[in-house]
């Protein structure tokens, strides 16, 4: 059986990176929530 998690830095950054988050309204809200919460890491 194939494992479901096949790590790739490129895919990770494209889907969950800072620039990907900032590209959409919802993504910007995610960053804002994480800032408000005081997260050390805002995105992947």
Swiss-Prot record:
Give yes or no: UniProt keyword Ribonucleoprotein.
yes
Q: Which Pfam families match?
A: Ribosomal_L34
- Give GO BP annotations, semicolon-separated: translation
What PROSITE patterns does its record include? Answer: RIBOSOMAL_L34
Annotated membrane-spanning segments are none
Q: Which GO terms describe its molecular function?
A: structural constituent of ribosome
Q: Where is the composition biased (Basic residues)?
A: 31-44
What are the boundaries of the region Disordered?
Answer: 23-44
UniProtKB keywords: Ribonucleoprotein, Ribosomal protein
Q: Which InterPro entries match?
A: Ribosomal_bL34 (IPR000271), Ribosomal_bL34_CS (IPR020939)
Q: Which GO terms describe its cellular component?
A: ribonucleoprotein complex; ribosome
Q: In the UniProt record, does the keyword tRNA processing occur?
A: no
Annotated family: Belongs to the bacterial ribosomal protein bL34 family.
Q: Which HAMAP family match?
A: Ribosomal_bL34
Provide the protein name: Large ribosomal subunit protein bL34
Chain's gene name = rpmH
């Amino acid at each position: 059986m194939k494992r479901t998690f096949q790590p790739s830095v490129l895919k990770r950054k494209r889907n969950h990176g800072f620039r990907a988050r900032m590209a959409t309204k919802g993504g910007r809200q995610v960053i804002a929530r994480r800032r408000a919460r005081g997260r050390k890491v805002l995105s992947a």
